[in-house]
């Protein structure tokens, strides 16, 4: 059970910190066979030029190989332990299969060490089990949904995320996302029962700019604070409002301007997300 801890204001950097204590998480090192080297780019491309702003620095990390396909059918597994993963907001669970293999999965809510987990065509509807959408009852809450059969989970993977099976339409299953969007997904795609754990992630407060730097996030400079050569909002005598509707440094409208342009998949969206 997660414990919300508010820090005492012993210093300016501790005054606003709200942390989440997780006594159930593994305190040792991760399973080394499932680790990969992860090198930082600092937002630069192969030419050394910044292609993604506000990236750089941060603590060194290893990537954990997560089983997003859940395709090891018919082999029973047990949750060996829950772990912290620096690469995502969700926690991860280390599974130990009956044949000795170990895999990481996203840790579902209410799943703890020692719980049995399985995947297959007709497994029971229990948190942590993975099966095709066509075999999941209407109204069931799921996470880690595939968008193409066998590609691996792409939807509802962050902390506290979930979707709901809303109905069936021929070869498709209707899925309601948290945004309110109703979407058609092929019934052969897999999903995991339950919602992603670590819902308390949204309650954390870093408390200081330095904590953001530990995560590899650099400062964001406002356009109105720049010179005209650097941003369309830049320049002017004294403080100004920018003089125009909000745009990016490249003059593209932002702050609410719709950018979706994918006609090919528009037919899969039954209802748009809530405004």
Curated annotation (Swiss-Prot):
Matching entries from InterPro entries are given as: NA-bd_OB-fold, Rib_uL2_dom2, Ribosomal_uL2, Ribosomal_uL2_bac/org-type, Ribosomal_uL2_C, Ribosomal_uL2_CS, Ribosomal_uL2_dom3, Ribosomal_uL2_RNA-bd_dom
Q: Which GO terms describe its molecular function?
A: rRNA binding; structural constituent of ribosome; transferase activity
A GO BP term here is: cytoplasmic translation
Q: Which Pfam families match?
A: Ribosomal_L2 (PF00181), Ribosomal_L2_C (PF03947)
Q: Which GO terms describe its cellular component?
A: large ribosomal subunit
Q: Which NCBIfam families does UniProt cross-reference here?
A: rplB_bact
Q: What is this protein called?
A: Large ribosomal subunit protein uL2
What species was this sequence derived from?
Answer: Hydrogenovibrio crunogenus (strain DSM 25203 / XCL-2)
